[in-house]
Amino acid sequence: IEELDTGMRNQFIEKFQEIKVEFDKVFKELFGGGRGTLELEEDVDILEAGIRIISQPPGKKLQNMMQLSGGEKALTAISLLFAIQNLKPSPFCLLDEIEAALDDSNVDRYAKYLHKLTKNTQFIVITHRRGTMAAADRLYGITMQEKGVSTLVSVDLIEDQLDDKPAKQE
């Protein structure tokens, strides 16, 4: 049991440090600067310690995540989610309006970063934001033409690149 406990502690510390470094990288990209870091609660067993998320958006002082505006909180949380996703991509991910509190410029950075992650993960994103929809490959919408009857609408946004390629010359 002691050997298992030591292994868990070592693995936790290693993964925590990896996530901490990646979180700062993603934070800087999504915020266009600033700094994001993670801290473990002190004077507590590491396997039971809380984790503080510390954020410093560009032009602001370093502060606990709970002191941020709604949009800053959302973008900080998204940064942490994407940092973990970068380190250990899951095959698919469902995001339900996580960018709702963001302003348009932050939605654009979020959508561009999300699109980069689609190389390793399929995302199902529920959104009302045009900036997020613009980064999608395919949109599905639900409309109600008549009361009680829902209709599914699908729009494929991937352009057919075959017509754009120059003809081969021999």
Question: Where are these predicted regions, by residue range?
Answer:
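Terminal ABC-like ATPase head and other globular end-domains that cap long coiled-coil arms
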Residues: I1-E170
